Amino acid sequence: FFSSRRRHTRLVRSRGLGDVYKRQVYNTNSYETLEALRMLDGLVDIYLPDLKYVSGAVSKKYSGTENYFEYAAPAVQEMFRQTGLLELDGDGLANKGVIIRHLVLPGSVDETRRVLKYIAENFPKNITVSLMSQYVPCYKAEKMPPLDRRLLRREYERAVDYCLSLGLENAFIQKMDSAKREYTPVFDGKCD
């Protein structure tokens, strides 16, 4: 995958198609090896990494692997090394940089606090963070309390308050009504 992406990006840039392909954006769950990410150095303009969990137990419960953070933390650091802080053009469009995304899960505000604390302690205070409230229970989550319900307003507000208390300066905060079916990709048609 990475080698074909590198070839494609180089081909696009060598043929002067920059006006067609303005930015190379890499959307990832961050469960990546450093070796793979280094293959993308200089080819990706904007990274959109998720940072889901710090706790191995939570990671195991929800993603089936205890070592998510062991891969994700250095991966996000590498993405930041490659592209730095988010930079916008005169029209407010992203030119380059990293937006670290975190989806606040129902019943998991303590895990969100651990993730935000890690970000605050390991990145500049003006790193861009997207603190997402758009969780919608789908598929097997419908039978896994507390993931069988939507995020409560008070849970999200606690997460936002903590984010701000850490001094993180550039946080995208969502409205609670973003957790709607029409905003959720349908992978198997089983979302409520």
Language-model features: locations:
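Auxiliary Fe-S-binding modules of radical SAM enzymes
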Residues: G84-D192
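Alpha-helix-loop-beta-strand connector modules within alpha/beta enzyme cores
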Residues: D19, M79, Y156-A159
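Single conserved hydrophobic/aromatic residue that forms the stacking wall/gate
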Residues: F1-Y21
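Structural motif
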Residues: V25-N27, Q174
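Distinct, well-ordered alpha-helical segments
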Residues: R15, L34-L40
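Anionic-ligand binding region
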Residues: Y62-S63, E70-D89
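Non-cysteine beta-strand/loop elements that form the S-adenosyl-L-methionine
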Residues: D41-S55, T128-Y135
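Conserved radical SAM core fold
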Residues: S30-L34, L51-F69, V98-I100, L105-G107, ...
